[in-house]
Amino acid sequence: MSMPTIRAVRALTVRGGGADYHDQDAGHWIDDHIATPMSRYPEYRQSRQSFGINVLGTLVIEIEASDGTVGFAVTTGGEIGAFIVERHLARFIEGQRVTDIEKMWDQMFYATLYYGRKGVVLNAISGVDLALWDLLGKVRQEPVHQLLGGKVRDELEFYATGARPDLAKEMGFIGGKLPLHHGPAEGDAGLRRNLDALADMRSRVGDDFWLMLDCWMSLDVPYATRLAHGAHALGLKWIEECLPPDDYWGYAKLRRDVPRGMLVTTGEHEATRWGFRMLLEMECCDIIQPDVGWCGGLTELMRISALADARGVLVIPHGSSVYSYHFVATRHNSPFAEFLMMAPQADRVVPMFDPLLLDEPVPVGGRMKVPDTAGFGVRLNPDVRMQRPYEH
């Protein structure tokens, strides 16, 4: 079988529900009073959208092969990401064989090194990489998890991230991760409110249900340490992404100082094997949480996972729906997965990328079998309005 070559790359943008999951209507739990790095400023404390968390929007990347097969993926990046894909990255993709994913990744990364390395450039590279894996799966008529070496488990088990872990327990999830609401700028009163909220949720879910706190880069080491010790009596399983991603020294100190048995996790906003190498070599955390749509795509996530596995560190990818599910199913050091509760009140299970994707699987009773359909097994919704702001 001769492999087709890549004929065209297209970068599209979408507003509203999609890969930029923060781009939600008013009243959604994800835009509530949640601690962020901007919470130090009172005017940006009540709503995360007030400081522009949803400004990028969704980036959709389509890659068309010479036989007419189209692979696609979605990530965060919007118009900025579309410009990077169309005006810079496309030259490294078009004309290549669909199997040459390693070469294409390498050229995209090193060609953007002088202005990239992390952030929206890596989002764009990640999106292209995921679209290439989707395309290869469709050309070969195999699911992506088969391309990665095959499943090591038949079923995935999930914890839920959202405002209502008590409801997540009723739905069959193994645990619930709460957003932290108050940061250091709100003082001791805010710290007490954080612990009171955790205590209230513990009383609702009982002693045997996992509870975790998502701190979204909003704390400093002293505050995070106090929070961890206060939460220990309430059975907190882990404390997540307390510090800015580049504060490896702070994470290393925090991990030494938290109560024995409490896990420190981070990596959602880290990228590439080199960033995660720092986290691992400096012993910053117990679990790394790369986002496959931001860290460099599946090609890079496999390298990151191998580094972690050699050190006995778990890899629990951040959200990402099907793009992480296919990966988690193939790795022993990813024993469970995250599900983002995207219903406005976190009171029901809805697809993470709804309405952008069709056929997107969701957990039932906190569990899911990863589909065996070709590629990632999802389709773009033709009723969602997309724009192509740039061409090449």
From Swiss-Prot:
Keyword field: Lyase, Magnesium, Metal-binding
Reaction it catalyzes: L-rhamnonate = 2-dehydro-3-deoxy-L-rhamnonate + H2O
Biological process (GO) annotations? amino acid catabolic process; carbohydrate catabolic process
Q: Name one Pfam family in it.
A: MR_MLE_N
Could you tell me which Gene3D superfamilies the record lists for this protein? Enolase-like C-terminal domain, Enolase-like, N-terminal domain
* Class of enzymatic activity (EC top level): lyase
> Which residues are listed for Mg(2+) binding in this entry?
214, 240, 268
Q: Which cofactor does it need?
A: Mg(2+)
The positions annotated as site (Increases basicity of active site His) read 291
Output the PROSITE patterns linked to this UniProt entry: MR_MLE_1
E.C. code? 4.2.1.90
Q: Name one GO molecular function term.
A: magnesium ion binding
Site description Transition state stabilizer, residues in chain: 338
**Keyword Transmembrane helix applies:** no
What are the positions of the active site? 318 (proton acceptor)
In this chain, substrate is annotated as bound at 22, 48, 338
Q: Which note does the record give on the cofactor?
A: Binds 1 Mg(2+) ion per subunit.
Q: How does it assemble?
A: Homooctamer; tetramer of dimers.
What does this chain do?
Answer: Catalyzes the dehydration of L-rhamnonate to 2-keto-3-deoxy-L-rhamnonate (KDR).
**Family per UniProt?**
Belongs to the mandelate racemase/muconate lactonizing enzyme family. RhamD subfamily.
Misc remark? Reaction proceeds via a syn dehydration.
Q: Which HAMAP family match?
A: Rhamnon_dehydrat
Protein name per Swiss-Prot or TrEMBL: L-rhamnonate dehydratase
Q: What is the lineage of its organism?
A: Bacteria, Pseudomonadati, Pseudomonadota, Betaproteobacteria, Burkholderiales
Q: Name the gene for this chain.
A: rhmD
